[in-house]
């Protein structure tokens, strides 16, 4: 088998395709969460704290000198990223929890024994008939007090 055909067999397996779709959706979801945190959650939170814009929160380690930009410790952006992570982690946790609950319900569901096929039913009937035919005859008992 050539490397190309092996790769093709690997790439079209259901799990790999599902994983790729999950990664793409996850990346899009990450952008949505980042926008939600940066544009919806942080502005009101900054307003409650006293009109603070979290994206501007930083400690200047070295001011800008000439064409060299300032060296900043941007802890406000870090706070936003931590909040992003918490929201994404919570969403993933809830998804995994729902999937695990569904798996437990599937495991609890009683599985009915498979119905026998027509061939199996017919073979069972033949077996039962053969057993009946091959039964030894019941022993005949003669009562000596009874006339024949």
Curated annotation (Swiss-Prot):
UniProt membrane topology term: Multi-pass membrane protein
Function, in words: Channel that opens in response to stretch forces in the membrane lipid bilayer. May participate in the regulation of osmotic pressure changes within the cell.
One of the record's GO cellular component terms: plasma membrane
Recorded superkingdom: Bacteria
Main location, first listed in the record: membrane
Keywords: Cell inner membrane, Cell membrane, Ion channel, Ion transport, Membrane, Transmembrane, Transmembrane helix, Transport
Pfam families: MscL
Coiled-coil ranges from the UniProt annotation: none
Record's protein name: Large-conductance mechanosensitive channel
Family assignment from sequence similarity: Belongs to the MscL family.
An MF annotation (GO) of this entry: mechanosensitive monoatomic ion channel activity
Assembly behavior: Homopentamer.
Subcellular location: Cell inner membrane
Annotated TM spans: 9-29, 79-99
InterPro entries: Mechanosensitive_channel_CS (IPR019823), MS_channel (IPR001185), MSC/AndL (IPR037673), MscL_channel (IPR036019)
Gene3D superfamilies, per the entry: Large-conductance mechanosensitive channel, MscL, domain 1
SUPFAM superfamilies linked: Gated mechanosensitive channel (SSF81330)
């Amino acid at each position: 088998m050539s490397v190309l055909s092996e790769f093709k067999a690997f790439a079209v397996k259901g799990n790999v395709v599902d994983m790729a779709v999950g990664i793409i959706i996850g990346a899009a979801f990450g952008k949505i969460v980042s926008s939600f945190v940066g544009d919806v959650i942080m502005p009101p939170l900054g307003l409650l704290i006293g009109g603070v814009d979290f994206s501007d929160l930083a400690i200047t380690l070295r001011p800008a000198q000439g064409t060299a930009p300032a060296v900043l410790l941007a802890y406000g952006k870090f706070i936003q990223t931590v909040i992003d992570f918490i929201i994404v982690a919570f969403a993933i946790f809830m998804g995994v929890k729902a999937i695990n609950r569904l798996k437990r319900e599937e495991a609890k569901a009683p599985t009915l024994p498979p119905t026998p096929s027509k061939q199996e039913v017919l073979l069972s009937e033949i077996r039962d008939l053969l057993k009946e035919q091959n039964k030894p005859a019941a022993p005949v008992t003669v009562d000596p007090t009874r006339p024949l």
